[in-house]
């Protein structure tokens, strides 16, 4: 039995709890800035192209020092180094965690079980690049000899969210002669809408499933195969020219009709939610080209090296992870908003939902004991300025503490017209105004000074002290996207290390899958399913009745 004290019994934890209740019970950002004129410049971290301003957080130098002591006591740096060394830190699956190897330079040496995996990584990247170039140039043609103009990625979870998010983020860098679509939902409507206006002769499907057995993905892939064959006269040979696989199961890939020469591998030391810079990113590489894809990998690597080498408090992922622990475990926050002021980042928060909530949505520690502290928050948000006309009301004047990240860029993408570029200043005016309003609010006296009737003063008062991080970069490029993703990857790692949970398994997704296999015969064949609870049994019966209504 370990002699290591539980997290909430550590003196560093107790010191933070005392600090939250005693020294800093009601932090006021107006006072903190007034007391420290240099706060705005001191509370900034720079990494790569990112300027990260954390001055509007409910912390003091003492808070930050105590948080850093907690990180040291919980062995964050040791676990970080073990991850980079390729040790099996995913303890429940006995796996290494080496998504960082996916963006390592060719001359790096990163070993798993004594074998350098970097040559394998670059062999797959080179194979991807060769294939992507053939599709982009028109050298790769479909069964009828026509060039590919449509690419449909079929996957789910990490095999979908990552490439779909990155494609939207980097649309300005894509080949606009190519149409990319992403299918993940086993709801047949998803595939139907994705292909309904496409020409099968010009469509390539990328099937992303490591085992080639993922039920949602293979169901959609089989339906896509039927759609293709229906459109091309039923010739089975067409499959090999219109389907490629991201998988390691050569036998099942071949059985499907895919040429295993067009199978792109990845490894069990890459978790799904960390995988889109592996072969899972093939659709993105086709869209933006191999050179841009490698620029994105360079961006990942910038933050990887920063996380590995920068000392606190200048280590950005460590800092952001500690701030999350501060709010969740000591100030009672239950959620975290990520608010990108870029239309191109419309799927970024959804991507972070999987990254964060699947990683740290755990209630037992690494030893299997129930945790006695808060773990991962609910992550949510949409691009600005849309959210301002929806849920910002609750953030400003509601009863919940919701830390928020604001992500913005100084320049719009080049391909916009001059008139549309001019709108960017309006977008960013809102970006800066919201963080100011959230931090400093509007006092009753300030409201009264505007001549507001006394009975309306409480309604128009903003208490402020809503914490935000501002992440600012010159523009959204492939490298900057890689930097942003790696920043959040390592932030999530830091929090999992402090909470002593395994951030790299996801057993919570399994039970529903198992039960779905048992329930399906009741829906399709009317079979009895033993063990259904009364509520679910009644719902299944109602479903069957409704199916028969026309």
Curated annotation (Swiss-Prot):
EC number: 5.3.1.9
Top-level EC class: isomerase
PROSITE patterns, alphabetized: P_GLUCOSE_ISOMERASE_1, P_GLUCOSE_ISOMERASE_2, P_GLUCOSE_ISOMERASE_3
Gene3D superfamilies from the UniProt entry: 1.10.1390.10, Glucose-6-phosphate isomerase like protein, domain 1
A single Gene Ontology CC term: cytosol
InterPro entries according to UniProt: G6P_Isomerase (IPR001672), G6P_Isomerase_C (IPR023096), Phosphoglucose_isomerase_CS (IPR018189), SIS_dom_sf (IPR046348), SIS_PGI_1 (IPR035476), SIS_PGI_2 (IPR035482)
Catalytic activity: alpha-D-glucose 6-phosphate = beta-D-fructose 6-phosphate
Keywords for this protein: Cytoplasm, Gluconeogenesis, Glycolysis, Isomerase
Listed NCBIfam families: PRK00179.1 (NF001211)
Family: Belongs to the GPI family.
Protein name: Glucose-6-phosphate isomerase 1
Species this chain originates from: Streptomyces coelicolor (strain ATCC BAA-471 / A3(2) / M145)
Gene label: pgi1
């Amino acid at each position: 039995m370990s002699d290591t004290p539980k997290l909430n019994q550590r003196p560093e934890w107790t010191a933070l709890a005392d600090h939250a209740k005693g020294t800093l019970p009601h932090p006021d950002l107006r006072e903190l800035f007034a007391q420290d004129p240099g706060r705005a410049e001191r509370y900034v971290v720079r990494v790569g192209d990112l300027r990260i301003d954390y001055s509007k957080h409910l912390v003091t130098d003492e808070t930050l020092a105590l948080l850093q002591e907690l990180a040291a006591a919980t062995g964050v740096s040791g676990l970080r180094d073990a991850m980079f060394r390729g040790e099996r830190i995913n303890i429940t699956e006995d796996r290494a965690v080496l998504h960082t190897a996916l963006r390592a330079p060719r001359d790096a040496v990163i070993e798993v079980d004594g074998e350098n995996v970097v040559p394998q990584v670059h062999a797959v990247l080179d194979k991807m690049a060769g294939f992507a170039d053939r599709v982009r140039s028109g050298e790769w043609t479909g069964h009828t000899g026509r060039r590919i103009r449509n690419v449909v990625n079929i996957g789910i979870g990490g095999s979908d969210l990552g490439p779909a998010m990155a494609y939207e983020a980097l649309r300005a860098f894509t080949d606009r002669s190519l149409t990319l679509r992403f299918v993940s939902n086993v709801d047949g409507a998803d595939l139907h809408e994705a292909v309904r206006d496409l020409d099968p002769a010009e469509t390539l499907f990328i099937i992303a499933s490591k085992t080639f057995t993922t039920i949602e993905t293979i169901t959609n892939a089989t339906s896509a195969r039927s759609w293709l064959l229906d459109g091309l006269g039923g010739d089975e040979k067409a499959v090999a020219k219109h389907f490629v696989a991201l998988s390691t199961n050569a036998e099942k890939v071949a059985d499907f009709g895919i040429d295993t020469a067009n199978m792109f591998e990845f490894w069990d030391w890459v978790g799904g939610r960390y995988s889109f810079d592996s072969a899972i990113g093939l659709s993105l590489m086709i869209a933006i080209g191999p050179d841009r894809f490698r620029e994105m990998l360079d961006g990942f690597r910038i933050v990887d090296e920063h996380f590995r080498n920068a000392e606190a408090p200048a280590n950005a992922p460590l800092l952001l992870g500690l701030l999350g622990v501060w709010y969740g475990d000591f100030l009672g926050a239950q959620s975290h908003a990520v608010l990108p002021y870029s239309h191109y980042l419309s799927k970024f928060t959804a991507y972070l939902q999987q990254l964060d909530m699947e990683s740290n949505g755990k209630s037992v520690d690494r030893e299997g004991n129930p945790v006695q502290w808060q773990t991962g928050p609910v992550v949510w948000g949409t691009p600005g300025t849309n959210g301002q006309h929806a849920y910002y009301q609750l953030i400003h004047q509601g009863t919940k503490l919701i830390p928020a990240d604001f992500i913005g860029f100084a320049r719009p993408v080049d391909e916009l017209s001059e008139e549309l570029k001019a709108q960017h200043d309006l977008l960013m005016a809102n970006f800066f105004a919201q963080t100011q309003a959230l931090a400093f609010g509007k006092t009753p006296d300030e409201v009264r000074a505007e001549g507001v009737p006394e009975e309306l003063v409480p309604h128009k008062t903003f208490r402020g002290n809503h914490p935000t991080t501002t992440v600012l970069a010159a523009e959204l490029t492939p490298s900057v996207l890689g930097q942003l993703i790696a920043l959040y990857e390592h932030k999530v790692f830091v929090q999992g290390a402090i909470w002593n949970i395994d951030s790299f398994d996801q057993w919570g997704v399994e039970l529903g899958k198992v039960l779905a296999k048992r329930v399906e015969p009741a829906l399709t064949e009317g079979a009895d399913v033993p063990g259904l609870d009364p509520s679910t049994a009644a719902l299944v019966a109602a479903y069957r009745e409704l199916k028969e209504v026309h």
